[in-house]
Amino acid sequence: MTPIRLSAMTATSCLGRGMAPFREALQSGRSGLMPCAFETVKLDTFVGEVEGLDAVELPDNLRSIFDCRNNRLAMTALEADGFADQVRQRAKQYGPARVGVFLGTSTAGILETELAYRERDAVTGTLPADFRYRGAHNAFSVADFAREYFGLTGPAMVVSTACSSSAKAFAAAARQLAMGQIDAALVGGVDSLCLTTLYGFNSLGLTSPQACRPFDPSRDGISIGEAAAFALLERVDGAEA
């Protein structure tokens, strides 16, 4: 088995941006779940919403194609903990073609489609002219965005198999590293809040009217949230070069 090094990692969720808020929340028992106030959703439930995403602006050269909540969440996470600098250093060290991108997502930027659907033409059903399927709803959008954001040209893939997505992304990255196809891999998962997920799980009677308590004998449902987490993997021989 080819040794692989975990060189950097970061995460962003309702707990905060970067690893420090995660550690603090675990140590203090703090929850980031809040009563749902997402978009126009009227549900008696709690959600894990990342604050401030509506105000995040993608770089000018990428905004017209990739602007959506999912990619704004991805960029927010990538810029925490100095992670983006680590990726750029590896791209310079190995070359952009030797850094792969392997990500997991389930709903990607479907929120943009949901909002566009509300604004469709009443007669023809045509979606708004500024709706961008490629850069939003398309599951590959998040990997496409990450590659453009860092100027990477190595192999890229997105896995969309619900809860197993990110685990499979790590497995795919490990195989590419083991075969010597790449020297480093940007791996992770991004999923943002959307109407389909919130209303869907609520329709199944699975959402709790309070913050979820997974290990409580009297637990009464789940809480839906959003988050992004990334890891930078390297072949040990490359990392030690």
Predicted regions and their residues:
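Conserved "HGTGT" condensation-loop signature of ketosynthase/thiolase-family condensing enzymes
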Residues: M1-P155, C194, N202-S223, A229-A231, ...
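Short, high-confidence coil segments that cap the C-terminus of an alpha-helix
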Residues: P96, I182-D183
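Alpha-helix C-terminal capping segments
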Residues: R147-G151, A174-Q181
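Short loop-beta-helix segment that forms the pyridoxal 5′-phosphate
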Residues: P155-A162
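Short conserved active-site loop signatures built around small residues
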Residues: S166
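Active-site histidine-anchored catalytic micro-motif
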Residues: A169
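Glycine-rich anion/phosphate-binding loop at the beta-strand->alpha-helix junction
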Residues: A184, G189-C194
